[in-house]
Structures are given as C-alpha cells and as structure tokens.
Amino acid sequence: MAQTEIYIINKDRHLSGEYVGVNGAMQGAWLIWMELEKKYLPSLPLKPWDNPGEYKSRIARRFDEHAMDEIWAIPRMKETEWSDRILMEIYMDSAYVGYDDLHEVAEALRNCEFATDNMKGQADALEKIHEEYPGILGVFINATSVCSISDFLDCLYDDDGEVLDMRLKEDAYDAVQYLRDMEKCDWDIEKYFETVGDE
C-alpha cells in the first residue's frame, strides 16, 4: 500500500533519516487535488460520449504536459479559502512545512470537509513531531511512496546505491510562509517576485 511519507528536516536542511509513513496515500494528496479541483474549477468540456452532468477532471489527463497547471494554481486564486491553500501548497514538489506551522497544517488536514484516515494520520504525525522534535526546521511531505524522493531532494548514494544523505534542494521553500507572502502581494505572482521573491 502506498504511504504518505513525512520526513524530519534538521536546521542544516539535511533530513534526519527518520520519517513517518501514513498508509492510504491515495486518500491524501491525490484526493485533496480531486476535491479542490471540483470546488474551484469548472469541469472540462464534455465529449458526446460522456455522461451528461459528469465532472470531467484535469487529473485524468495528468500525463499531458500542462494538463494539471490549473490545479496547481488553485492556492494562488483569490477566492481559495486559506485552509485549502495550505492543503494544496504543502504537497508541491519543492515545498516543506516549517516547524512553527505544523499545528496549523495539522488543523487544515484534520478539519477539511472531506478528511480521511490518511489526512487525520498525517495531522497526528505532525502534532507528534512538533512535540517530540523542537528546534527542527520542519518536515518534507512526500505525497506518495510510489514517487522517488530523489525527484524532490538532493540525495548522496554509496557504491551500492544506498542513500547516505538527503537534503532539501536549493530551491526548496517554506510552504505556509510563501502563502503568507503571496497574501501580502494580493496573490499577484509578479508582485511577489518583485518584492519578496528576491529577498
């Protein structure tokens, strides 16, 4: 069964080697993307052979280049609720959750209208990490163990291909802080890069 993997990040941006696995990854980020797509985006146009009234998702076309771009833009849409922004942003490829925001992210996962056992399990794990690991930078969440973490992290391997060390990539960013900065810029990405992005 695919798991959502939550990795602990030390202050030096290296992963501690410890992680929490939460079963049922398809009921985590994947479900969040599907539900928030329906909430904020219109259905794709139906074909004659589609069922009338059916919601046609962009996710079904995920292997087409740019098919998911509108979904990834949901956190920056002005009408998106704050907790939904968090639910989307924490799973972005280069995002991590800062230590001080673990409680807020846990609440967003636990209290969303379609919360599943996976989401509640993630929330419990984040609360426990906050309690047991003071002083860490935060956590990196790999949406599903089916994905290779080397796609999102810099990994150092030994001669046998075993991972010796993992660290955040240079372009990794604090997901919730990014949303706060974007809110100050009224969700204007160009204004963000002019004012905050170059800091």
Task: Briefly describe each language-model feature range.
Residues K11, K38-K39, K47, K56, ...:
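Context-gated lysine
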